[in-house]
Amino acid sequence: FLNEMDLPYKKVDPLPNTAITLKVEEELFDNYKLYELVRNKLWSSGVEVIKNKTTTKDDFKGYDVVVVATYAKLNDLLEDKKEYQFEVCEKPVVRLPREYQGKSIVIMDGPFMCLDPYGQRNHVLGNVVHAIHETNIGEEPIVSDELKQYLNKGVIEKPKHTNIDKFIKTGKRFFKDFDKLKHIGSMYTIRTVQKNREHDDARPTLVNHEGGNVYSLFSGKIDTCVDAANELIRRLQGD
């Protein structure tokens, strides 16, 4: 694939329990800095930002165009409700040995894991299996009371319900001194994907006209946000 796409890479000594390990150039972003950039861009553009408010359909009144981009809560605001697959996911934030600082590593392909820099010194972990605590298919997520208290509240320190031990057990197969990490805490959220797509893990970005002046945007990948915005503009100009 890398050869076909003419992407640079270098073979290095393979990590334990891997057939091949490749070093590649990959762009990452600092989520803290990105937050500041987006916030400043909104303010400088005269966009009114309203936080800590529950939006209802009554709030749609008085606008030329309404774009619903509420991810797991799309069905809360749309008349035509769709079924999705909802997954309560945990993203542990850890401090790894210094040799991992600034490095992003993905073990692929299959039920494996990844680690990515988070801020200046920490990493955030991902795992195809152990990141998911609960899952359901339907029009709205079903979340246990134990996990509901953690959702979308940033890094939860010393969470009672965590799979960090399973993350560590998996990571030890591939990463030296992985069990020496410090668990800073974990973030919890609801990942929303199309139902029954385990065979290809498809994560499409969908821009739909819901009728009248209402549009919806369904996407869970930050790297598609610009394409999604451009597609929305194209649809608005076409309609």
Per-region residue spans from a language model:
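General small-molecule cofactor/ligand-binding pocket signal
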Residues: P8-K10, E48-I50, L181-G185
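Flavin-binding catalytic cores
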Residues: R121, H133-R191
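C-terminal catalytic lobe of FAD-dependent flavoproteins
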Residues: K169-D239
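Central helical "cap/lid" subdomain
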Residues: D64-D109, Y118-H123, A131-E134, D145-E146
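Helical element adjacent to the flavin cofactor pocket in flavoenzyme catalytic cores
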Residues: L22-L78, C225-R235
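Amphipathic alpha-helical segments that form well-ordered structural scaffolds
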Residues: F1, L37, K41, K166-F174, ...
